[in-house]
C-alpha cells in the first residue's frame, strides 16, 4: 500500500447533490428552496440573532452588573512563583522587576497555589489565609 493510492471504502462517500439542473433530478426549478421568501433568493438571509424586526432577545433582557476598572491594578502571585523567585524579602517593586506582575499593578496578593519551603518576608503585600499559613510554616513573615 502506498500513501498516494489510498482510497475511501466503496460506498462510503456520496457525490454532492447537484441542485437546479432539471426536473428529472428531483431538485430542479426551485432547487429545494421552496417558493418565494427571503430564504429562496440569492444572497438573501438574515444575520444571526435577527428576529424579523421583533426586538431581539439580547436586547429584551436587562443588563446586569459591570466590569470593574480596578481589576487591572490588582495582581495575584502564587506560592510556587514566589518559591522560584528566590528572594528573602519581597515587595511590589521586586515583583515588578521579576516580571511576575504588570507595571500598572498597585495591589498584589499571594495565593496558595503550589508549595513554599524557603523563608520569605513580604513587605506591603497581602496574602490569603492559606498562603499566610504556608509562608509562616516555612519560617517567613508578612509585614
UniProtKB/Swiss-Prot annotation:
Q: What does this protein do?
A: Binds to the 23S rRNA.
User: Taxonomic classification, please?
Assistant: Bacteria, Pseudomonadati, Pseudomonadota, Betaproteobacteria, Burkholderiales
Subunit details: Part of the 50S ribosomal subunit.
Q: Which InterPro entries match?
A: Ribosomal_uL15, Ribosomal_uL15/eL18, Ribosomal_uL15/eL18_sf, Ribosomal_uL15_bac-type
Q: Which UniProt keywords apply?
A: Ribonucleoprotein, Ribosomal protein, RNA-binding, rRNA-binding
Q: What organism does the UniProt record list as the source? A: Delftia acidovorans (strain DSM 14801 / SPH-1)
Can you quote a single GO CC term?
Answer: cytosolic large ribosomal subunit
Could you tell me which residues belong to the region Disordered?
Answer: 1-56
Single GO MF annotation: rRNA binding
Q: What is the protein named?
A: Large ribosomal subunit protein uL15
Give one GO biological process term.
translation
Highest taxon above the source species: Bacteria
Residue ranges annotated as compositionally biased, kind Gly residues, are: 21-31
Q: Which gene encodes it?
A: rplO
Q: Which family does it belong to?
A: Belongs to the universal ribosomal protein uL15 family.
Amino acid at each position: 500500500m502506498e500513501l498516494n493510492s489510498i482510497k475511501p471504502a466503496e460506498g462510503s462517500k456520496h457525490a454532492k447533490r447537484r441542485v437546479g439542473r432539471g426536473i428529472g433530478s428531483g431538485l430542479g426549478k426551485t432547487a429545494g428552496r421552496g417558493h418565494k421568501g427571503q430564504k429562496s433568493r440569492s444572497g438573501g438571509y438574515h444575520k444571526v440573532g435577527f428576529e424579523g424586526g421583533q426586538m431581539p432577545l439580547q436586547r429584551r433582557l436587562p443588563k446586569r452588573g459591570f466590569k470593574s476598572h480596578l481589576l487591572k491594578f490588582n495582581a495575584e502571585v502564587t506560592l510556587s512563583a514566589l518559591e522560584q523567585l528566590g528572594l528573602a524579602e519581597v515587595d511590589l517593586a521586586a515583583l515588578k522587576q521579576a516580571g511576575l506582575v504588570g507595571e500598572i499593578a498597585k495591589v498584589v496578593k499571594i495565593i496558595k497555589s503550589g508549595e513554599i519551603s524557603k523563608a520569605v518576608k513580604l513587605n506591603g503585600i497581602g496574602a490569603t489565609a492559606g498562603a499566610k499559613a504556608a509562608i509562616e510554616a516555612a519560617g517567613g513573615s508578612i509585614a
